[in-house]
Amino acid sequence: MLHVSQLFFVPLCPKVSNYMNQKLSHIDFDQAGADVFCFDNGTQVREYHAIIRVQQACLPFAQQVEAVLNAYNSLLAQLPGAQAVFKRYFLSDAANQADAIVVNDVTDCAKSIIQQAPLDGTKVALWVWLMTDVQTSMTQSELYEVSHGQFRHLFNASAHNLAANSEYQMRLLFNEYIMQLAQERCTLADNCIRTWLFVNDIDLNYGGVVRARNQVFFTQGLTVNTHFIASTGIGGRQQDPNVLAQMDNYAIAGVRPEQVHYLYAPTHLNRTSDYGVSFERGTMVSYADRRHVFISGTASINNKGEVMYPNDIVKQTQRMWENVEALLVEADCNFDDVAHMIVYLRDVADYQLVRSLYAERFPGKPCVIVHAPVCRPGWLIEMECMAVKAVCLPNMPQF
């Protein structure tokens, strides 16, 4: 039996259609709960983002996994026609837990499994992105394909290898991904929209990841004079301690150049290339009926590339929100359009305070706070998010 304890309707764009809306809901299941964002603009494809969390932290891991999977299946039953297109499991101890996820979750979609402990004291949490009226399959390139209309959305998750160090591992990951994209008649520069790079012991191994990405991007025509790719580079551990870098990614086959725009917010942030790294602050992809906005991992930084408010978690959180909001505004969005948030904390002792700040500002928003050191030690907190907004752009292709 499920109980919906909160339900909010937020009009998106009444000038476009009265049917276009977003909906937030909290659903309590047996031993787990879900915060759900629904985007339904009256066209064929509805989208859902959900964060599912265990409600009893004292349960053994096996029961926590069961609670999350049961909640997911119950949620799916309430969303006619919806299919998962991407999942991410946040684990407290990947070495002992990852295999259980692989065995018990047989969903036919890309599944990211990473050790980034949920900071509410539980052992597992799940973010899932769902869509209706799409066809899903595994391609010969081993990317997961989600098809609707003229687009094929290509997802990959938990890619890793055992090369000698983080630089070699990252270079091999990108080279393999470039070959996978080529099999789909795509390129890294033209089709890849978003990457996630998880770095084991990020304080030690991030430099190698950065060097590899810079080198690969240069060979692919991704430079400060063209564009980079929205990304999160964050601490995260795979079940094998010899894996120093793990990658998830998302590309769109068939996307047109005029659909993709990059976000800069120069009043608040500088170009990442100014301090030697290669990613975009955010990317928006526009369709005839909706806009997707992918905000990269964002911290308390200014437009000179400096850490703002060292050792002050409250002010860093507020500056981070300000930076994210500036990027969203550039895409003609705001926090109401955000479908989910992932928050990364370096110090577990900051959790209760950060949780209270988020609960006050973003009540009911799908959000998970996890333990994951940020790429620069001075940053105590980082967040990423995705926004979905209804638009009316008849010159763009339909989603």
Please state what every model-predicted region is.
Residues 8, 15-339, 345-399:
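N-terminal presequence-like segments and the immediate start of the first folded domain
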